Regions:
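Short hydrophobic/Thr-rich beta-strand motif most characteristic of the beta2 strand and flanking loop
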Residues: 25-32, 40
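Acidic catalytic/metal-coordinating carboxylates
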Residues: 33, 59-62
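Conserved acidic carboxylate
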Residues: 8
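Charged docking surfaces used in two-component/phosphorelay signaling
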Residues: 12-23
Length: 119
């Protein structure tokens, strides 16, 4: 079973994502901010980081950067309402990261997660 670390500060969106991913057969560890997600990542390995970009305490780009330092093989996907401006060329986000724009459709999310984990 694939393990996904989820960082999303919006409670409803986080519950929505957890339910969709668990129904698709993934094990999900949900967190409401980047700092707590990073602390969890330091405790155990995950195959994927699924994160919002704009969050309190530590934003998703910083979380992704640190996650890549801990585990260069971790797959990273951003889910954000700010997709158009989120990952410009000056961004410190990992180059292989995928971005999905909110609102995200469950079928698309699960499909993209499966594609990234299979790569």
């Amino acid at each position: 079973m694939h393990k996904i670390l989820l960082a999303e500060d919006d409670n409803d969106m986080r519950r929505f994502l957890v339910k969709a991913l668990e129904n698709a057969g993934f094990q999900v560890s949900p967190h409401d901010n980047g700092l707590s997600a990073y602390q969890r990542l330091r405790e155990e390995p995950f195959e994927m980081l699924l994160t919002d970009i704009v969050m309190p305490e530590m934003d998703g780009i910083e979380l992704a950067r640190r996650a890549s330092e801990l585990d260069p093989d971790i797959k990273i996907m951003f889910i954000t309402g700010f997709a158009a401006v989120s990952l410009n060329s000056d961004s410190e986000a990992p180059k292989n990261a995928k971005v999905l724009a909110k609102p995200v459709h469950l079928r698309e999310l699960v499909s993209e997660v499966n594609k990234m984990l299979a790569a």
